[in-house]
C-alpha cells in the first residue's frame, strides 16, 4: 500500500484517536459492574506463532505472529465460531465494544475469535519485529 504524506497523517490521526478512545473506556465491554476479571464468559488472549510467513508479495515475514483474542467457548459441534477481524486502525480491545449479553455478539452464545491484523502493534508490526525487518524495513503488507 503506497501512502503519500497526507494519507499517512490522516491514518495516524485516526489510529491515535481510536487508541485514546479505547484507553478512556468509552465503550465498556459489557453491561456488568466490576472489573474485567468478572466477565460471565471465558476470555483468553494469546500469541499465535506463524513462524516465517509468506506474504502476498512473496516476501517472508520472519518469526511472524498474530495476537488473538477469544471470548466465549466453542460448542461441541464447533458451529458457533465467529471470526471478528480488527479494522486497519483498530485492535481486539476496540472490537470488544460489540461483546456482551445484550450486544451484537454474545460470548455466552458464540465463540468470538479476534485476530489482530499485521501492523496493528499487537501482531507482527514494524515496532515489534527483529532489527532485520523493523521500522522502514518491514515488508509491504496487503489486506
Placement of each model-derived feature along the sequence:
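N-terminal export signals
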Residues: 7-29
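Gly/Pro-rich cap/lid or specificity-loop segments adjacent to the active site
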Residues: 89-143
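Short beta-strand element of the alpha/beta-hydrolase
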Residues: 79-87
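Primarily extracytoplasmic ectodomains and periplasmic/lumenal surface modules that are beta-strand-rich
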Residues: 73-77
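A short loop-to-beta-strand scaffold at the N-terminal edge of the catalytic core in hydrolase folds
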Residues: 61-72
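Generic short beta-strand segments
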Residues: 46-53
Amino acid at each position: 500500500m503506497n501512502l503519500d504524506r497526507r494519507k499517512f497523517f490522516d491514518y495516524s490521526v485516526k489510529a491515535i484517536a481510536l487508541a485514546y478512545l479505547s484507553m478512556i473506556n468509552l465503550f465498556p465491554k459489557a453491561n456488568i459492574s466490576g472489573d474485567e476479571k468478572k466477565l460471565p464468559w471465558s476470555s483468553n488472549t494469546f500469541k499465535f506463532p506463524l513462524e516465517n510467513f509468506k506474504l502476498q508479495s512473496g516476501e517472508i515475514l520472519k518469526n511472524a505472529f498474530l495476537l488473538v483474542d477469544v471470548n466465549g467457548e466453542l460448542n461441541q459441534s464447533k458451529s458457533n465460531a465467529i471470526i471478528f477481524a480488527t479494522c486497519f486502525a483498530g485492535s481486539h480491545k476496540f472490537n470488544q465494544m460489540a461483546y456482551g449479553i445484550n450486544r451484537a455478539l454474545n460470548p455466552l452464545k458464540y465463540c468470538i475469535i479476534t485476530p489482530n491484523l499485521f501492523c496493528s502493534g499487537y501482531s507482527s508490526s514494524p515496532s515489534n519485529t527483529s532489527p532485520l525487518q523493523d521500522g522502514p524495513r518491514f515488508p509491504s503488507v496487503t489486506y
